[in-house]
Curated annotation (Swiss-Prot):
Record: residues binding an anthocyanidin: H19, G384
Source species: Arabidopsis thaliana (Mouse-ear cress)
Keywords: Glycosyltransferase, Transferase
Enzyme Commission number, as recorded: 2.4.1.120, 2.4.1.177
Listed SUPFAM superfamilies: UDP-Glycosyltransferase/glycogen phosphorylase (SSF53756)
Pfam families in alphabetical order: UDPGT
Name of the protein in question: UDP-glycosyltransferase 84A3
Function: UDP-glucosyltransferase that forms glucose esters with phenylpropanoids. Glucosylates 4-coumarate, ferulate, caffeate, sinapate and cinnamate.
């Protein structure tokens, strides 16, 4: 089959695991419907690791369902040893300057397979500028909750009061959201945050989405989970197509494909180890790819797990390349009680019957995976949207218990409290309630991605519109 006859979609991702994975899942789904997808991110550090972990060859078409996907990696322009790559304030404008030209060059290189749509995630908002300049429809994948999107929207338009330097402790009242205390709003919006640059880039994406009238705004959620908030946002932004298409990882599970976005090879024996455990006997612990806890806090969590009597599967990442963080050391007796790995297939782990609960940083990817697996969460957020996600898990979805309030709290949670919260999530009436609620959300998520479900129909509508645009352009002789 001639790939040049396929509708061609180019996806551009910020180089980070939590950004790459959802966008790649979307890309695989698009390809599976008979389209051609080119997935683009930077060569270092993530592209290089993706290539190694997945045996990816640049530009080579890989079949996915009825279509194809390929990968392109471009240089970010930094020398190998340039530490500015790991300084977001320096990296952001540099990536924009280099990336705009690289994406233009890629689009022109594939002129015999004209790009019908450009899709990006929120940390590379400048892709919308490229799309507008080249007169290509664009779409954005939002990889946080619709609740967080609403918070950013209200902050950007100054529709309600948010914490300020003079009033840092005020709560925030947003329609369709629970009352958020000052440390429960997305932390990048708080004036005390050391990471306000992350909030700025997200706000840049919001501005571009409104100004450029992007083709679609995808959200990795499902309608049944955030119905009222989505209806409210659709009323606020009638010109936008706000389209929930999640859980993306669940949608992508229906595909037979070896294309993955992992930066590391998962531990090969962790699933076999789980097979040897009793049902609901293991706490799974992972704090994502970015968050770094203090050694003292890691030790308190370790001793809390030991006191709880649960077995543990714990993902402890080595320090990221270019960062100056000491590797964590865990008590030897914990290793005898459980299994410590650098990486694991989280979706499969959470679905395993041995998992009793998930001690999580509450990033949105992990939140969606826990809800879809029907697993209770012990919430230990650090920053960004994680603190808001923790509110929803504990108070709205009612599948979680709160262990901490975020890095801004600047306190070490004791081993006694860790053990108490682990037991609360796994033993007794509260644990039964959490598990029942989690199973209910699991069923709702499965219904959303099933044939004819809300997310499935939203996705099919998008693909149909893209294909129609492509056919119309061909009929008009456009290239």
């Amino acid at each position: 089959m001639d790939p040049s006859r396929h509708t061609h979609v180019m996806l551009v991702s910020f180089p980070g695991q939590g950004h790459v994975n959802p966008l790649l899942r979307l890309g695989k789904l698009i390809a599976s419907k008979g389209l051609l997808v080119t997935f683009v991110t930077t060569e270092k550090p993530w592209g290089k690791k993706m290539r190694q972990a997945n045996k990816i060859q640049d530009g080579v078409l890989k079949p996915v369902g009825l279509g194809f996907i390929r990968f392109e990696f471009f240089s970010d322009g930094f020398a190998d040893d340039d530490e500015k790559r790991f300084d977001f304030d320096a990296f952001r404008p540099h990536l924009e300057a280099v990336g705009k030209q690289e994406i233009k060059n890629l689009v022109k290189r594939y002129n015999k397979e004209p790009v019908t749509c450009l899709i990006n995630n929120a940390f590379v908002p400048w892709v919308c500028d490229v799309a507008e300049e080249l007169h290509i429809p664009s779409a954005v994948l939002w990889v946080q909750s619709c609740a967080c999107l609403t918070a950013y929207y209200y902050y950007h338009h100054r529709l309600v009061k948010f914490p300020t330097k003079t009033e840092p402790d005020i709560s925030v009242e947003i329609p369709c959201l629970p009352l958020l205390k000052h440390d429960e709003i997305p932390s990048f919006l708080h004036p005390s945050s050391p990471y306000t640059a992350f909030g700025d880039i997200i706000l840049d994406q919001l501005k571009r989405f409104e100004n450029h009238k992007s083709f679609y705004l995808f959200i990795d959620t499902f309608r049944e989970l955030e119905k009222d908030i989505m209806d409210h946002m659709s009323q606020l932004c009638p010109q936008a197509i706000i389209s929930p298409v999640g859980p993306l990882f669940k949608m992508a599970q229906t595909l037979s494909s070896d294309v993955k976005g992992d930066i590391s090879e998962p531990a090969s024996d962790c699933m076999e180890w789980l097979d040897s455990r009793e049902p609901s006997s293991v706490v799974y612990i992972s704090f994502g790819t970015i968050a770094n806890l203090k050694q003292e806090q890691m030790e308190e969590i370790a001793h809390g797990v030991l006191s709880s009597g649960l077995s543990v599967l714990w993902v402890v990442r080595p320090p990221m390349e270019g960062t100056f963080v000491e590797p964590h050391v865990l008590p030897r007796e914990l290793e005898e009680k459980g299994k410590i790995v650098e990486w694991c297939p989280q979706e499969r782990v959470l679905a395993h019957p041995a998992i009793a609960c998930f001690l999580s940083h509450c990033g949105w990817n992990s939140t969606m995976e826990a809800l879809t697996a029907g697993v209770p969460v012990v919430c230990f957020p650090q920053w960004g949207d994680q603190v808001t996600d923790a509110v929803y898990l504990a108070d709205v979805f009612k599948t979680g218990v709160r262990l901490g309030r975020g890095a801004a709290e600047e306190m070490i949670v004791s081993r006694e409290v860790v053990a108490e919260k682990l037991l609360e999530a796994t033993v007794g009436e509260k644990a039964v309630e959490l598990r029942e609620n989690a199973r209910r959300w699991k069923a709702e998520a499965e219904a959303a991605v099933a044939d004819g479900g809300s997310s499935d129909m939203n996705f099919k509508e998008f693909v149909d519109k893209l294909v129609t645009k492509h056919v119309t352009r061909e009929d008009n002789g456009e290239h």
